[in-house]
Design a protein with these regions (language model features):
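Short, low-to-moderate order helix/coil transition modules at the start of elongated helical scaffolds
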Residues: 2-252, 256-262
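Conserved beta-strand/loop scaffold segments within soluble protein domains that form the structured core
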Residues: 135-137, 141, 145-430, 444-472
Length: 472
């Protein structure tokens, strides 16, 4: 993510153009638009898949063709798979040095601040451009601890092939929903992380996903395995320039958290307003382990995103902290799911949503407590801030409690910006637009404080971008 050096940023100073960079089309190869067996086989050939993966793709395609589109949530009628290009290979192979990445691609990531962030505060970086990872590197001292951080194709065709086969799409099977099946058929790119038992990766790893091609889809797969007693913070960033045609993001994240291990997965999504973001994220947590999700959703035309945690071992814990900002023409349907599948597990879901200019920001939660999960606790809290009379925010909680000896609660709040607070800040010298942006930033502060400082600043600047033009 781009690291801004000043603590205070006026609304007028935030530059949207860094995200709207459009590189000239220069793909080395791309498949035809649409989706059929020939296209899936072509992708598999381009990827040099082992036989089992080729078969997996074709079975996923059959599942995709047999499943209906979900009949709940935002409308995706504007997404026509006949017009989506599912694989675009950039004009470079993966590199281990930024100096070796072609200038047009490198310049895009430079403007987004990825190399700078790597030098300042990251243990390793992966950068994907369209359908392929173009850069991947991990610091030597981290690799020396036995940590594996590489693109997933290298792991699939290398020494970690069996580990990939054992875990790939086991948490999110193609039968999960239609777009999971689509992902299974056409996935490309993404990262593989393995942290050995007892190893603490003290500074974060990051993957950044950039979709440049108009009318294309991005289907990266991130697989993270953190062994017993280990720790990892993984950061995911994404962006794309805006086009007049639909783009699709249907990635997948699978996280395996070992006994007494801890994983934090932070995401700042800034997709363009023509993007359909239909991403699936899931974690399985063993005894005494912890999964922490931190999520910021600021872009896309339509989003369906509900990270799910399966608390499989006694004392496993999940925390989800998220913020969503929906503006004009956006329908963002987000939230979190948790399954308490063992005794004395706990979950805490905290979300904040902001809507303006007719935007729709919905929150969904699903808490399931299985019969063997006695002593478990779950708390769900969501707050919504409406900036006008045209916007909409709904809370849709689900609770499936199959055990008596549990403590489960849900609370929801909705409010508006206080005009008295705006007047006070204006009396202290702020413009009305900056005053409103400051109040919204304060509303989002509990989420920002969960991020490393560079990313908290980035999130606040994205809020400022969304607030531009909020007056009048």
């Amino acid at each position: 993510m781009r690291a801004f050096e000043t603590e205070k940023t006026d609304v007028a100073e935030v530059d949207r153009s860094i995200y709207d960079i459009k590189d000239k089309p220069n793909a080395a190869f791309e498949v035809d638009s649409g989706l059929d067996k020939a296209i899936v086989e072509q992708i598999s050939t381009e990827k040099h898949d082992p036989d089992w993966m080729r078969d997996f793709r074709l079975k996923s395609l059959d599942i995709y063709n047999s499943m209906p589109v979900q009949n709940w949530g935002p409308s995706i009628e504007g997404l026509d798979m006949r017009n989506i290009v599912t694989y675009v290979r950039p004009n470079t192979e993966m590199r281990g040095k930024w100096s070796e990445v072609p200038d047009d691609i490198k310049n895009t990531f430079e403007r987004l601040g990825i190399p700078k962030a790597e030098r300042a505060s990251l243990a390793g970086v992966g950068a994907q451009y369209d359908s392929e990872v173009v850069y991947h590197n991990v610091k030597a001292e981290v690799a020396a601890q036995g940590v594996v951080y590489t693109d997933i194709e290298s792991a699939l065709n290398g020494p970690y092939a069996e580990m990939i086969r054992t875990h790939f799409m086991k948490l999110v099977p193609p039968t999960d929903h239609k777009f999971a099946a689509l992902h299974g058929a056409v996935w490309s790119g993404g990262s593989f992380v393995y942290v050995p038992a007892g190893v603490h990766v003290e500074i974060p790893l990051q993957s950044y996903f950039r979709l440049n091609a108009p009318g294309a889809g991005q289907f990266e797969h991130t697989l993270i395995i953190v062994d017993k007693g280990a720790y990892l913070h993984f950061i995911e960033g994404c962006s794309a320039p805006k086009y007049n045609v639909a783009n699709l993001h249907a990635g997948c994240v699978e996280i395996y958290v070992g006994e007494n291990a801890r994983v934090r997965y932070s995401t700042i999504e800034n997709w363009s307003k023509n993007m359909y973001n239909l991403n699936t994220k899931r974690a399985k947590v063993e005894k005494g382990g912890t999964i922490e999700w931190v999520s910021g959703s600021f872009g896309s035309h339509t989003s369906c995103l509900y990270p799910m945690s399966i608390l499989a071992g006694e004392g496993a814990r999940m925390e989800f902290t998220g913020i969503t900002f929906a503006g004009a023409g956006q329908d963002l349907d987000t939230g979190a799911k948790v399954v308490h599948a063992a005794p004395n597990t706990s979950s805490h879901i905290t979300t904040k949503s902001i809507a303006r200019d007719g935007g729709i920001s919905n929150f969904r939660s699903a808490v399931t407590v299985l019969p063997n999960a006695a002593g478990s606790k779950s708390a769900v809290s969501c707050e919504s801030l409406m900036l006008d009379d045209q916007s909409r925010s709904d809370t849709i909680p689900e609770m499936d409690i199959r055990c008596d000896a549990v403590d489960v609660g849900h609370e929801a709040k909705i409010g508006r910006i206080s005009e008295e607070a705006v007047f006070y800040l204006m009396s202290r010298g702020l413009s009305e637009e900056d005053a409103r942006a400051l109040i919204v930033g304060g509303f989002a502060e509990p989420i920002a404080k969960e991020l490393p400082v560079e990313y908290a600043v980035e999130m606040n600047n994205l809020i400022h971008l969304e607030m531009k033009g909020s007056i009048g």
